[in-house]
Structure formats: structure tokens, C-alpha cells
């Protein structure tokens, strides 16, 4: 009874626009209340609805019609809402799944990017470390080489200073000694200092002798070259004179009185030219 009463109340609350059946034309109904003058058994008259005239339904039929249409409409609306709710839930689940997938994908991309950055950073740090180590090794090698060169230069300077001091301590009279005498003094020396001293004297003597010989040789070569140049110049002059005489001999055909003198002059020039060539 309660369910029927609630359905009736729901049917009474539904407006007339919601009671339209699908596929049926909407009609305007007007309920006629019984006239008080005629009593309860009076029937409703026909009234005008819009521009058309339709018979008026009795007011006793309206509650049942409202109840049936309301229940059918509500059931259909409930099914539509359920279907829409199901679709929305499916769409929401799909969107939630897509959201979680995108979130997981984004997290994986972030982790991959972090791993890539970490790997690159480690490789860069390792490269910088190796470069720094190679640079340090190169600097140490250069320092060691510089120290070695410095030590060698210092040793060479000390050796040169010692040799200079030994040469300064040499007696000038010892320069007049022969090489054999110096060698004898080295053989007869008792100490290493004496040997070094006599050896320095021998080396100095050899250097001086070599320099003197080179100087003498250069002077002699210069004199020889000068003599050669002078002889060549004289040969050229004599040769030119011989050519001139030949030309004069050929051109002076009219002068035949003294051929013997000209021939003698030519022989003299040839003789002088031969002598100059021999020299």
C-alpha cells in the first residue's frame, strides 16, 4: 500500500510535459469540474483545445494514466541514467588508466633522463680526471727535463771554469815545449792534477798549432789565388793582342815590306802567352 501511495504521489508531482508518450502528438487537455448546480453526475462538456476540437477526457481516467506513464517514463529514464552512468564510469576508468599510464611513462622518462645525465656526468668527470692526470704527468716530465738540462748546464759550466783555471795556471814557458816533452811529462806525472794540467797544455798547444796552420794555409791560398788571377788577366791581354795582330795582318795586304818583323812579333806574343799559361 505504501508503494502504491508513493507511486501515486510521484505521479501527481510529475508535470504534464513529462507525461508525454514518445511518438504521440502533444495535446492540451482541460479537465472540467462538475457543476455545482447540476450535481455529481454531470458530464464534462467539449471544450476548444488550440485550434482543434477534441473530446475532453473524464477526470476519473487521469490518475491511472498519470501513474502508468510516470512509471514507464521513470523506468526508461532510470535505464538511460544507468547506461549513461555506466558509460561515464567506463570513460572515467579509461581516463584514470590513461592518466596512470602517462604518469608511469613520465616517471620512466624522468628516471631514464636522470640515468643518462648521471652517465654523462660520470663520463665527463672521468674524462676531466684523465686529462688532468695526463697534464700533471706532462708537467712533471717537463720539470724533470728542465732539471736535468739545468744540472747538465751547471756541470758543463763547472767543467769550463775548471779548464779555464787550469789554463790560467799554465806557465807561459811551457808553451814553447814540444809535444813529445809534454807527453813525457804526462807519463812521468805522479798525480791526477799534474796529468790534467799537462793534458790541458797539450790540448791548448794542439789548438794553437791547428789555428796557426789554418791561418798559414789560408794566407798561402790567398796568395796563390791572387797570382792565378793576375796570370789569367795577363793571358787575356796577350790573347787580345794576338787577335789584334792577326786582324792587322789580314787587313794590311798592301804593306808587304816587313813580313818577317810581324811574324817575329807574333811568335813573341805566343811565347809570352805560353809562359803565362805555364805559370
UniProtKB/Swiss-Prot annotation:
Residues 1-21, 247-268 are annotated as: Disordered. It comes from the Eukaryota. GO terms for cellular component: nucleus. InterPro entries: MIPOL1. Residues 1-11 have a biased composition (Basic and acidic residues). Residues 65-169, 218-255 form a coiled coil. Residues 248-263 have a biased composition (Polar residues). Keywords: Coiled coil. This is Mirror-image polydactyly gene 1 protein homolog. It comes from Mus musculus (Mouse).
